[in-house]
């Protein structure tokens, strides 16, 4: 029975793959400036500079769009934790170190642009936003595959494979979330901004996906262990956001990111790209874990069906409430006239 490769061995063996994918990334990426996506002429001073404080009526975004934008921004705000995580697992030497810093620099634009847009358009309470940012960054983040707990848990990815496989799914999930949030905003500038951000996330996903693919070819059993751990315990990095569960329900009900999207647009495309259920190089315990993963996919499908039913019932309840309110308003209006 062959021994698992150490992280140092994996880093060394995968270094040419990383360098190749960095070069490809640099030819595909597009330079852009956050300020080009902000409607500055819509802005005005807040109270401290002689203007007025934020008023909820100023926001032109729907509740779903507002909650999704807030959640996306707070997720981006935790970049210091993400940088720490990948630096710890990828190292800061050679091509790996170059990628860590390059990725961080590109990711940093996202939070800058989203915050500027929300503050200039007065789409969200700036005081609440800053309070949430402080709390979110103070909490930090460690990958969800280690079942991060609320409170003082201080858990990290256990291996290079844990980290690179997790961020593959996370980057794709973030891309999908940003893209669907742009559509939910129903506002041209916001949609263009989030298209630009999601394009960055897609290129980042491709980098991690292809490095992971090389890892599967190099040490399939070892990679399979990490894949099983990642997917069966997956949590988005926004998990640490205050009141995340309530926000997640709003986002899911609004069609921005729900169980069906997670399975069909995130999980399955990556598994198909890696040919997880077609490969014949998993042996022993890894083969068993692949079978368990297939069962997990079936469970995710069941969750999707249950969610779709619950969502439809919720929409029907909302429609009935709106119908009753409209009828009541009509009756009041008729009486007044």
Regions inferred by a protein language model and the residue ranges of each:
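Non-heme di-metal
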Residues: 1-337
């Amino acid at each position: 029975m062959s021994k698992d490769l150490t992280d140092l061995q994996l880093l060394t063996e995968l270094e040419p793959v990383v360098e190749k994918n960095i070069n490809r990334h640099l030819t595909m990426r597009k330079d852009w400036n956050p300020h080009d996506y902000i409607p500055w002429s819509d802005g005005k001073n807040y109270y401290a500079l002689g203007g007025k404080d934020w008023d909820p009526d100023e926001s032109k975004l729907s509740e779903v769009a507002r909650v999704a934008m807030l959640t996306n921004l707070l997720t981006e705000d935790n970049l210091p934790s993400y940088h720490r995580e990948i630096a710890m697992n990828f190292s800061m030497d050679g091509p790996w170190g170059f990628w860590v810093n390059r990725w961080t620099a590109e990711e940093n634009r996202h939070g800058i642009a989203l915050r500027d847009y929300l503050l200039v358009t007065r789409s969200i309470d700036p005081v609440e936003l800053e309070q949430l940012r402080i709390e979110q960054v103070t909490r930090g983040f460690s990958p969800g595959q280690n079942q991060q707990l609320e409170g003082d848990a201080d858990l990290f990815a256990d291996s290079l494979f844990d980290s690179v496989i997790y961020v593959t799914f996370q980057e794709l999930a973030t891309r999908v979330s940003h893209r669907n949030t742009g559509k939910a905003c129903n506002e041209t500038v916001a949609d263009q901004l989030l298209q630009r951000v999601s394009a960055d996330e897609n290129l980042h996903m491709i980098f991690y996906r292809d490095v992971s693919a090389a890892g599967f070819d190099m040490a399939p059993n070892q990679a399979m262990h990490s894949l099983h751990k990642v997917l069966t315990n997956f949590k988005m990095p926004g998990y640490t956001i205050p009141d995340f569960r309530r926000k997640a329900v709003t986002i899911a009900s609004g069609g921005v990111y729900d169980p069906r999207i997670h399975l069909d647009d995130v999980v399955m495309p990556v598994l198909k790209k890696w040919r997880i259920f077609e490969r014949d190089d998993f042996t022993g315990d890894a083969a068993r874990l692949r079978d368990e993963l297939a069962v997990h996919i079936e469970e995710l499908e069941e969750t999707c069906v249950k969610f779709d039913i619950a969502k439809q019932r919720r929409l029907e309840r909302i429609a009935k409430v709106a119908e009753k309110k409209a009828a009541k308003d009509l009756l009041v209006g008729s009486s007044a006239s």
